[in-house]
Amino acid sequence: MPIGSSTRRSRALTGAACLSAVLTAALTGCGTSAEQAAPPPAQVPAAPPAGRPAAQPERADRQELNAQASAAQREAAAQRRVQTARRWGLAAVPLRAPAAPSSRPELAEGPGVKRTAGLPPVVYRVPTQDKVVFLTVDDGAEKDPEFSRMLAELEVPVSAFLSDYLARSDYEYFRRLERQGVAIQNHTVNHPDLRRLDDTRQQQEICGQQDRLEREIGTRPRLFRPPYGEYTATSLRIAAGCGITAVPLWNEEAFADHLEYRYADQRLHPGDIVLTHFRGPDSWKGTMTDMLRRFLDAATAQGFAVARLEDYL
């Protein structure tokens, strides 16, 4: 083959190869550039419809409005409590009790609790570290509507231990108290000294009042307070037999014109049970609302809230 022909053919092949390489490089370069410039449509975030704000700012605005409304409600409630306390002549707004314990404290033998195997515990002071005390009202002689209203407006939790011979003249008064949150408990039928009664009479006094209160109020008491704070082992056994689980006594007593303390320091203590009575001017130097005002002011001044006894016993 002539050298000249071979050379021309070689140059033609070389030119074709170069052209192919150039075209391949151009195509590859164009493809890469297009991918970098325009991501797939799925990667582009969709714009919100015209005239509609983004979701996150709307949610934040709603949360802010809710927080402002809640704060306003709390402030209004606090102002109502101040006004109510003033209306009833209190020196300060009563303190709010903490949330009720998730379970009742164990009532082991101790300074404020007496235990006898198989019998309901006798409790003078509930074992708790909470700065709370408990108000209990005995008998049922005075049926003061202002006392009922004061309890309701100030939201004071109270336990009423009723004796039938005094309560029976107007059980409707105590039904109204129960409907507004007062717990109704047992204080015997006729308020006798149980130590002087035989088993049969004690049964009639304790379990008879259980039956009466269940019939009149609609609930069967769990708590029993013996008259004068006096009882025997037989009293506790009979009480347990008709549904009693604890026997709360007391450490302090509230009157219309003063408080009586059990201990020399003359102060309330966490878990103290306070006794008072359904009494009025015929028996006291004042009214039941005077008694409640004095007691609440003393508790508040000493840093105590009034809690519901049945949440702890």
Per-region residue spans from a language model:
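Sec-dependent bacterial lipoprotein signal peptides
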Residues: 1-28
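N-terminal low-complexity, Pro/Thr-rich disordered segments
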Residues: 18, 28-124
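CE4/NodB-like, metal-dependent polysaccharide N-deacetylase domain
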Residues: 45, 152, 157, 183, ...
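Active-site beta->alpha N-cap acidic-glycine motif
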Residues: 94-186, 190-193, 212
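C-terminal domain-boundary segment and adjacent tail
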Residues: 118-128, 168-169, 286-313
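Structural recognition of the beta-strand scaffold that forms the well-ordered cores
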Residues: 133-137, 158-162, 183-186, 222-225, ...
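Acidic-and-aromatic substrate-binding clefts and catalytic sites of carbohydrate-active enzymes
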Residues: 140-143, 162-170, 193-200, 225-231, ...
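His/Asp/Glu-enriched short active-site or ligand-binding loop at hydrolase and phosphoryl-transfer sites
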Residues: 230-267, 304-311
